[in-house]
C-alpha cells in the first residue's frame, strides 16, 4: 500500500514522502496513529497543492528577510553606557540591550536570540553585529557605543 507520511517516521521517511509499506502495517499502525494517509489521487493532488503553497510562502519569507536585511544594513543603533577610565564601559552591551534600542530608535522588532556578537562589547566605539533573519539571509547591524 502506498502511504503519504504526515509526520517524520524514523523507520519509513520524512513528512510528505510517498512510501510503499505492507497493508497490515499501514492499517494497524500508520493510519490509526495519523502518521500517514492512503495515497489516493485526491490525497496526492492535495499534497502537490500543499507543496506549492509551502514553496510560495518560503519565497515570500525569503523576500521579506532580504528586504529587512537591506533596511538593517543602512541603520545604526546608538547605545549609551556609563564608562570609566580609558573608555571602558561598566559591564558589557548585550544583545538584549541592542534589540531594545533597535526597537526604540528604528522601530525594528529583532529577536535578541538571532543576534550574534563575535566579541563582547566592553568599550566605546562602533561594532558590527550579525543578525540571522532567515536560514539564507544574514544582516549586519552597526552598533555605536557612546558615553552616557
From Swiss-Prot:
Q: Which UniProt keywords apply?
A: Ribonucleoprotein, Ribosomal protein, RNA-binding, rRNA-binding
Check the record and name the InterPro entries matching this protein.
Ribosomal_bL9, Ribosomal_bL9/RNase_H1_N, Ribosomal_bL9_bac/chp, Ribosomal_bL9_C, Ribosomal_bL9_C_sf, Ribosomal_bL9_N, Ribosomal_bL9_N_sf
Q: Which GO CC terms are listed, alphabetically?
A: ribonucleoprotein complex; ribosome
According to its UniProt entry, the function of this protein is described as: Binds to the 23S rRNA.
One function term, GO molecular function aspect: structural constituent of ribosome
A Gene Ontology biological process term: translation
Could you say which protein family the record assigns here? Belongs to the bacterial ribosomal protein bL9 family.
Keyword Phosphoprotein found? no
What is the protein name given in its UniProt record? Large ribosomal subunit protein bL9
UniProt xrefs under Pfam families: Ribosomal_L9_C, Ribosomal_L9_N
